[in-house]
């Protein structure tokens, strides 16, 4: 606890930790109340033999009753075991809608253990303690479920089926379902365990019969049975809401059948269960109970028979007319749940040929066109820029920096952080001292323009190498000077103590020098001067740290001094997750390097920060369609941008979706944790981008839900798909890519994330979806529709034309036969003026693992194909091929 407290204290967030502890404690204390009542109930049962009773349970009646008691306990234990596993593994996932999460391989083992525990008398005595402890543990671990249910605000949106606010589905439904599950499993266990206790009193098992429980015990059993019935009624009532987010045929949510048949039956069942519970508690009401049980059985039989009959006789013959209002609601809700209702739609009819006017109009697009894919650039970095075996470039991110003083359009670059990979240390260097005291951090990063290459075909660099040998270069072809790069991208003090690679704990500063970076054949050493870490200078702090980590060597390490601190959770996603466990941190973080004036709170000259994308999501949004069979999300928001200092480890959380009810609820619980996006320094905000993880989901949903007419949606005639392309010899789906282009004839180009789309089972281009990233337009979506009466070639078709071109296929064949491997890069489809331009970079590498070099650029306007060493050269050749021949006089 001391280490956790000190860790939160470095962010001045110890109040958040204290509040979480208090929420867990309060949840556990509240859970003790029903447990206390259950204990009192069980102690009230009289286990002594019923001598006065003349009525006995014998034969099959005794067997059936005993089996019922055992079955009740097994069902209860199955629910409890599932909740324990889920609460321990990911307690916040309970907020997505409770479900038993027992793996199939675990189910037989847990069932066998539960059966042995129920049947073995000594173990059975321990079961009440196990169930009580489990309920308290689950309730405490589910503190986030209770907190969100209490604090989530009204959204102002009401679903039309049960007229509940959407916030009920997003935040309160899970809490109610978990509460009913805990109470039901506890009540079932008490009923089954108490009944088994009465049935197995000596000599009942040897005689295989026992006296019927006396009046006092019968009243207690009836009271618990009535409680079980009330809880079943509550679950039945709550299950009506679950109809709103389960797929029923073509409708993502409750359709005509659910409203006309299923929901009324469930409401009727709820009333009947409550009446039966009341009858169970009333004395001398055996006839009433039997009649209610008969009515309940008839209702269930009618429900199971009437539903398929109604579907077959009424719904199927007139499905479209009956389901139209529900389809409209499903389309509207799905589009809102994934922000497709924010899309601005436009149309674009490209001209068949590229003209000089198009080139002038699209100059800013062409001057920033990405020719380097991340994969070949990373491959080059790993061979030329890792510099030591223990350095690693885990990923490369596309970004933009204001490098050109002449233009308003930032230069698009690819930035890759050089992190320390401790698993790559030589075996003799993997000592405890080296791993935790010496090799503590990575250093530096590379920055490359996306649109140029060197004379050897390899990437050019604005920033390369590291330490005092760091090379900062301008680019004459782009008109960028060295001073422009130095001004926009600081490189000094580029030690990366926190990154995206998983790293062990580090102790710094100590009496041992830390490896900083290599300089020629020598090494440069340093001592950590940042503000991160848990102090371990005092012997009591060292004892706490050694206990926390299970590392006794911290107690005897002579290199630790009074200023030493323990650096833990150095993977930036782990760092954010520890502070905000309710956020989903899907996707890779990306590094930015910004000038001093724009940094958040920092105690050093550090300029490097990681941006981590935080998502809120739910699988219980009314009438919204799930993303896929493997992804149950029905609601998704990129609600938080987390900024982590790469040197000091500070974490700041900025709310990027202030209208999201989920993040508003969490901001009510932890107001000191969040800041508005306006509070983010502008120099960091200039590097924000729509995460591909969100954009991919939006593209997935748009493929069906771009259709807003329920009749067209029902017919399924207008479904889109992501086109295919061949990359490095494999056919893959076209991934969304960043381009700098003009939006809807605007004069200035913007940094866009673009995804082309084609009709299902057809390769023609039908639309684009673009996410805007700059300024006040951040997060806006633009859908560009292409004319349906004019076929526009899709990426797969253009790539086929490229491979069929005699000149190009001849060159590719010569390279392949010459011992080299041709790698066709990502095919980009970009708007240039009034024309579409298809651009494919071609890389060449040795068959035995050589460096990929950018060798050719292939361009096409959809009719003509040209290839050259450079993009301007390829465009010139394309225009020469498309220009009409000049008429000559006689």
Curated annotation (Swiss-Prot):
Could you list this entry's UniProt keywords, alphabetically sorted: Cell membrane, Membrane, Transmembrane, Transmembrane helix
Which Pfam families does the entry link to?
UPF0182
A single cellular component GO annotation: plasma membrane
Q: Which InterPro entries match?
A: UPF0182
Tell whether Transmembrane is among the UniProt keywords: yes
KW Cell membrane (keyword) present: yes
Q: Where are the transmembrane segments?
A: 21-41, 64-84, 98-118, 134-154, 173-193, 219-239, 268-288, 295-315
Enumerate the subcellular locations listed in this protein's record, separating them with semicolons: Cell membrane
The stretch of residues making up the signal peptide is none
Topology with respect to the bilayer: Multi-pass membrane protein
Highest taxon, organism lineage = Bacteria
**What family does the database annotate?**
Belongs to the UPF0182 family.
Q: Output the HAMAP family linked to this UniProt entry.
A: UPF0182 (MF_01600)
Name under which the protein is recorded: UPF0182 protein SYNW1212
């Amino acid at each position: 606890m001391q280490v956790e407290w000190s860790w939160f204290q470095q962010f001045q967030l110890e109040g958040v930790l204290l509040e979480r502890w208090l929420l867990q404690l309060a949840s556990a204390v509240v859970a003790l109340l029903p447990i206390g009542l259950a204990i009192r109930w069980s102690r009230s049962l009289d286990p002594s033999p019923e001598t006065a009773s003349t009525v006995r349970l014998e034969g099959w009646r005794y067997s059936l009753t005993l089996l019922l008691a055992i079955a009740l306990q097994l069902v209860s234990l199955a629910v409890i075991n599932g909740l324990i596993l889920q609460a321990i593994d990911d307690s916040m996932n309970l907020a997505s809608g409770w479900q038993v999460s027992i793996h199939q391989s675990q189910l037989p083992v847990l069932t066998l253990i539960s059966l042995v525990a129920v049947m073995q008398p000594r173990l059975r005595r321990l079961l009440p303690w196990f169930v009580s402890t489990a309920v308290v543990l689950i309730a405490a671990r589910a503190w986030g479920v209770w907190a969100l249910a209490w604090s989530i605000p009204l959204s102002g949106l009401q679903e039309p089926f049960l007229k509940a606010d959407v916030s009920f589905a997003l935040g309160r439904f899970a809490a109610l379902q978990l509460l009913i599950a805990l109470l039901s499993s506890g009540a079932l266990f008490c009923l089954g365990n108490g009944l088994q206790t009465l049935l197995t009193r000596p000599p009942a098992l040897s005689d295989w019969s026992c006296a019927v429980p006396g009046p006092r015990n019968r009243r207690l059993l009836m009271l618990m049975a009535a409680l079980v019935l009330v809880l079943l009624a509550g679950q039945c009532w709550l299950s009506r809401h679950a109809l709103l987010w389960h797929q029923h045929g073509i409708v993502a949510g409750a359709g005509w059948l659910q409203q006309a048949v299923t929901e009324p039956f469930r409401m009727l069942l709820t009333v009947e269960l409550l009446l039966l519970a009341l009858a169970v508690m009333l004395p001398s009401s055996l006839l009433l109970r039997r009649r209610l049980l008969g009515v309940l059985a008839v209702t269930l039989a009618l429900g199971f028979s009437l539903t398929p009959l109604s579907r077959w006789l009424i719904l199927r013959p007139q499905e479209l007319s009956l389901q139209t209002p529900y389809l409209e609601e499903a389309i509207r809700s799905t589009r809102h749940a994934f922000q497709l209702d924010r899309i601005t739609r436009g149309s674009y009819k490209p001209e068949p040929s590229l003209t000089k006017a198009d080139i002038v109009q699209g100059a800013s697009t062409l001057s920033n066109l990405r020719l380097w894919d991340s994969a070949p650039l990373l491959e080059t970095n790993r061979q030329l820029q890792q510099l030591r075996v223990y350095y690693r470039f885990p990923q490369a991110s596309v970004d933009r920096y204001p490098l050109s003083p002449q233009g308003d359009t930032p230069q698009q670059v690819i930035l890759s952080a050089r992190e320390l990979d401790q698993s790559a240390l030589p075996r003799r260097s993997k000592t405890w001292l080296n791993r935790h005291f010496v090799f503590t951090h990575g250093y530096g990063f590379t920055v490359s323009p996306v649109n140029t290459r060197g004379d050897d075909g390899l990437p050019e660099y604005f920033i390369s190498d590291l330490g005092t040998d760091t090379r900062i270069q301008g680019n004459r072809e782009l008109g960028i000077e060295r001073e422009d790069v130095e001004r926009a991208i600081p490189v000094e003090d580029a030690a990366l103590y926190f990154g995206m690679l998983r790293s062990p704990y580090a102790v710094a500063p100590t009496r041992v020098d830390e490896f900083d970076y290599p300089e020629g054949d020598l090494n440069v050493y340093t001592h950590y001067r940042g503000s991160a870490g848990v102090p371990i200078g005092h012997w009591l702090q060292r004892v706490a740290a050694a206990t926390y980590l299970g590392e006794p060597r911290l107690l005897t390490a002579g290199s630790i001094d009074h200023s030493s601190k323990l650096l833990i959770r150095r993977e930036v996603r782990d760092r954010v997750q520890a502070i905000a466990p309710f956020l989903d941190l899907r996707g890779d973080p990306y590094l930015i390097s910004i000038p001093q004036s724009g940094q958040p709170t920092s105690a050093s000259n550090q300029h490097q920060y990681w941006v981590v994308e935080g998502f809120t999501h739910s699988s219980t949004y009314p009438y919204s369609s799930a993303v896929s069979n493997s992804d149950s999300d029905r609601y998704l928001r990129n609600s938080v941008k987390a900024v982590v200092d790469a040197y000091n480890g500070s974490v700041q959380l900025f709310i990027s979706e202030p209208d999201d009810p989920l993040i508003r609820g969490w901001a009510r619980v932890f107001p000191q944790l969040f800041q508005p996006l306006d509070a983010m320094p502008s120099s960091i905000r200039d590097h924000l981008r729509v995460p591909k993880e969100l954009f991919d989901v939006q593209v997935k949903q748009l493929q069906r839900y771009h259709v807003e007419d329920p009749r067209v949606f029902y017919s399924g005639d207008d479904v889109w798909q992501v086109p295919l392309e061949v990359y490095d010899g494999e056919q893959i789906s076209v991934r969304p890519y960043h381009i700098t282009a003009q939006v809807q004839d605007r004069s200035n180009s913007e940094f866009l994330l673009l995804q082309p789309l084609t009709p299902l089972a057809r390769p023609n281009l039908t639309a684009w979806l673009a996410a805007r990233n700059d300024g006040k337009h951040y997060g806006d979506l633009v859908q560009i529709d292409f004319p349906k009466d004019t076929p526009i070639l899709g990426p797969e078709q253009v790539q086929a034309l490229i491979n069929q071109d005699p000149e190009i296929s001849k060159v590719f064949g010569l390279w392949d036969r010459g011992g080299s491997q041709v790698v066709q890069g990502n095919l980009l489809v970009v708007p240039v003026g009034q024309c579409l331009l298809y651009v494919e970079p071609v890389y060449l590498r040795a068959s035995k693992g050589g460096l990929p070099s950018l060798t050719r650029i292939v361009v096409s306007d959809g009719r003509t194909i040209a290839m050259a060493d450079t993009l301007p050269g390829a465009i010139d050749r394309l225009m020469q091929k498309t220009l009409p021949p000049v008429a000559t006089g006689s």
